């Protein structure tokens, strides 16, 4: 099978459409001067990791997470295919503590993946941040679970987001990620996966161990679309008086 790998914005196709016009830029600038972007302004962290499709491990994507804390036990992240200004918004991830994960229904748990080996293996890092500072937070991340959906299949060269959202998973052991993708990221960001792995050896995952239903429960997962009867408007209670 041919590998479908997307390493960064530099390896993706150009998005079709006209170049942003000067008039549009002026309007955007004027609006940004008076509007609040409070949710986006809460983003405090850039994490780089690698995701694979939950139904096809040969399809792998470099994923740049721009995250904010909802509270001490939950983060929410916008995912881009690169760190540059022209990066494509390809997905999102919710990250929760082990405590919150354990409150989820069993069927829901299958959609979430563990972060222990992603962190301890050195595959998740903060571009530009010294290792010692990274490790203070990543020690916490190693104990969490994440739920990821990607909406844009950049690894297939799609110029626009086409098709259904895809459930994504994270690395759980060695040998799952293509070596050339890791090497390319190491070169671009000046990091060492092996070096970080050694430095993170003291870290531990969830206190109760990785839940057996996490990571798809060991099975592949894929969303499917089916037609259903739509609820007619007459059956919806009136909201106006």
Curated annotation (Swiss-Prot):
> Which family is annotated?
Belongs to the OBAP family.
Q: Got any disulfides in this one, which pairs?
A: none
Family annotation (InterPro entries) = OBAP-like
State the coiled-coil residue ranges.
none
Annotated transmembrane regions: none
Polar residues: which segments have biased composition? 1-12
Q: Where is this region: Disordered?
A: 1-22
Q: What is this protein called?
A: Oil body-associated protein 1B
Q: Which branch of life, at top level?
A: Eukaryota
């Amino acid at each position: 099978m041919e590998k479908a790998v997307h390493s960064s914005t530099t390896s993706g196709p150009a998005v079709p459409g006209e170049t942003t016009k000067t008039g549009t830029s002026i309007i955007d600038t004027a609006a940004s001067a008076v509007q609040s972007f409070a949710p986006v302004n809460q983003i405090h962290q850039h994490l780089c990791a690698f995701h694979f499709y939950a139904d096809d491990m040969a399809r792998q994507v470099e994923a740049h997470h721009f995250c904010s804390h909802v509270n001490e036990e939950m983060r929410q992240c916008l995912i881009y295919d690169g760190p540059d200004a022209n990066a494509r918004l390809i997905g999102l991830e919710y990250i929760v503590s082990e405590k919150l994960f354990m409150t989820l229904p069993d069927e829901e748990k299958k959609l979430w993946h563990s972060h222990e080996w992603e962190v301890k293996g050195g595959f998740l890092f903060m571009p530009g941040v010294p290792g010692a500072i990274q490790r203070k937070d990543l020690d916490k991340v190693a104990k969490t679970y994440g739920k990821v959906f990607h909406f844009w299949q950049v690894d297939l060269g799609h110029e626009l987001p086409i098709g259904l959202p895809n459930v994504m998973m994270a690395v759980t052991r060695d040998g799952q990620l293509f070596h050339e993708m890791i090497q390319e990221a190491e070169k671009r960001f000046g990091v060492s996966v092996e070096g970080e792995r050694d430095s993170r050896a003291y870290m531990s995952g969830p206190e109760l161990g990785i839940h057996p239903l996490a990571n798809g429960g060991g099975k592949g997962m894929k969303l499917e679309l089916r037609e259903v009867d739509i609820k007619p408007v007459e059956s919806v209670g009136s909201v106006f008086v």
